[in-house]
C-alpha cells in the first residue's frame, strides 16, 4: 500500500492500533536525519538533503472519524482526503 501526500508518495505505511498512530515513510525510516513538527502538530521527518521522507499522524482514527480533509503544512499546505488513509488504519483492525 502507498499513500501520496502533496508531491510525496509514501511506500511504507504502518498503523499502530494500540497507540492510534499512523506512520508514513518513503523507503527505509532510518534514512531520516532531521525532525520537525507541522503547525498542525504532525511529526515530519527529512533526509540529509532536506527531502520529506516521513510523516507521523497521532490520533489517526480520530482524524479519520472527522471526515474533514486532514491538513498538513510540509512546508506547503496540503490536504488529505480521509478516505485515502482509511485503508491503512482499517487494515490493522
Where do the PLM segments sit?
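Intrinsically disordered, low-complexity and often Lys/Arg-enriched segments
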Residues: 1-6, 89-93
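N-terminal first-folded block
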Residues: 3-30
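Ser/Thr- (and often Asn-) enriched beta-sheet segments in non-cytosolic proteins
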Residues: 4, 9, 71-73, 79
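Phosphate/ribose-recognition catalytic cores of enzymes acting on nucleotide-derived substrates
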Residues: 10-13, 44, 69
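Amphipathic, hydrophobic secondary-structure cores in small proteins
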Residues: 24-64
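A short, polar/charged loop-to-alpha-helix boundary motif
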Residues: 62-74
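Cysteine/selenocysteine-centered motifs that mediate thiol-based redox chemistry or coordinate metal-sulfur cofactors
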Residues: 74-93
Amino acid at each position: 500500500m502507498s499513500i501520496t501526500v502533496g508531491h510525496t508518495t509514501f511506500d511504507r505505511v504502518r498503523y499502530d492500533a494500540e497507540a492510534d498512530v499512523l506512520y508514513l515513510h518513503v523507503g527505509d525510516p532510518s534514512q531520516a536525519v532531521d525532525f520537525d513538527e507541522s503547525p498542525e502538530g504532525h511529526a515530519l521527518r527529512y533526509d540529509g538533503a532536506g527531502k520529506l521522507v516521513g510523516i507521523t499522524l497521532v490520533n489517526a482514527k480520530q482524524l479519520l472519524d472527522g471526515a474533514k480533509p486532514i491538513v498538513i503544512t510540509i512546508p506547503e499546505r496540503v490536504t488529505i482526503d480521509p478516505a485515502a488513509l482509511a485503508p491503512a488504519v482499517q487494515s490493522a483492525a
